[in-house]
Amino acid sequence: MPLAMELDFVQPRQSFTSALSRGSRNFFGRSKRWSRWEFWPPYLFYPPVVAYIAYLGIRFRSWTLFTAANPAIPAGGFVGESKHQILDHLKDAAPWLPFSGLLECGVPTHRLAEAKEFMRRQGLQFPVVLKPDAGQRGAGVAIVRSLEQLNEYLMNSSFPVILQEYVPGEEYGVFYYRHPGDARGRVFSVTEKRMPVLLCDGRRTLEELIHADDRAVCMSDFYLRKNLDRSQQVPAPGERVQLVEIGTHCRGAIFLDGVDTITSALEEVIDRIAQSFDGFFFGRFDIRVPSRQDFMAGRNMKIVELNGVTSEATHIYDPKLSLFDAYRVLFEQWRIAFEIGDFNRARGTRPTSVTDLLKATREYRRLAQGYPE
């Protein structure tokens, strides 16, 4: 096998899929995707989780009690919340934040001028990150490397956009919670995010290499769309080709269980940052950092995003973990969300109504239809 997904390099060999036609390889990839639960579509994976949430709703006498877990975030961060407003709540943790600015809807040329002025004022150079202010699962996130790409993104976006400093390095997801009244919170989960990298043999095209890999073939449709302009190129032998840039599982990143990176130093820093956000108790920090050593020491970190109640402990997508492991973690996660919501309800926080939650979901889906891939 000529490739490696930043996990383990192996010697090149001829794969079964290399002998297949392009159509057959695509069919093989889609079929293999169904055999690995981490790639299942939401409608197949989430029914047991939804059933457990319904059970918790009966037990705690509120279907939407989880929305009270984070009183400072609309609907607790269930859907459609402003990422920019959340980062604003973390201003007391400014050393841990990259420069970010919000480009409201408006005339594209005016937005471009605003973006250029923001970059000038903050001393930012390309690349920068653009993403919808309300977004989930990496939808609409782009790394732009030129003024032309920036202009193209803004010309095709009719929604509020966050322009953020690009932070190089490694990426981690840190799931945190704190029961109201407790002096300290807890790091519940850490996910190491790896970008898929192919080790090329100098003989096959990028498309053939993607189809030859046991894991990459499961997401071949997505990888080929993201690399359409070079899919028929033959990279040099030994060349490493990174397939995606965004650290989201459904967009091709590899997620690994990072439990061994949790240290007292890391927990102390995360807890201090979380408690600077009054009314936040439950969610996941997405963090960029120069190295694993820096991360474990809780230093040189930048929080690129903070997600609320619909965050997942994404280490469950580690290929080593079973479907049973994933459900066990998610059930515990949702139980904690309901427990925190119950405590906050007793202190006067009102859960979002089912009607308002459905309305927010419909509005987000309408907005997200216009997001670039």
Per-region residue spans from a language model:
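A long amphipathic alpha-helix within ATP-dependent nucleotide-binding catalytic cores
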Residues: I210-A297, F343-P372
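C-terminal active-site "lid" helix and adjoining low-complexity regulatory extension at the edge
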Residues: L3-P12, P290-E373
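Coil-to-beta-strand transition motifs
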Residues: G169-E171, P180-R186, G279-F282, F295-M301, ...
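Active-site nucleotide/adenylate-binding loops and adjacent lid/helix of ATP-dependent enzymes
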Residues: A72, S82-R225, T263-E267
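A generic structural signal for short coil/turn motifs at secondary-structure boundaries
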Residues: G138-G140, L256-D257, H315
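A short, terminal or domain-edge coil/loop segment
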Residues: E6, F16-R30, Q122, E152-V161, ...
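Conserved N-proximal alpha/beta basic substrate-recognition cap immediately N-terminal to
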Residues: S15-F126, Q136
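A structural signal for short, well-ordered beta-strand segments
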Residues: S100, V174, I287, L306-G308
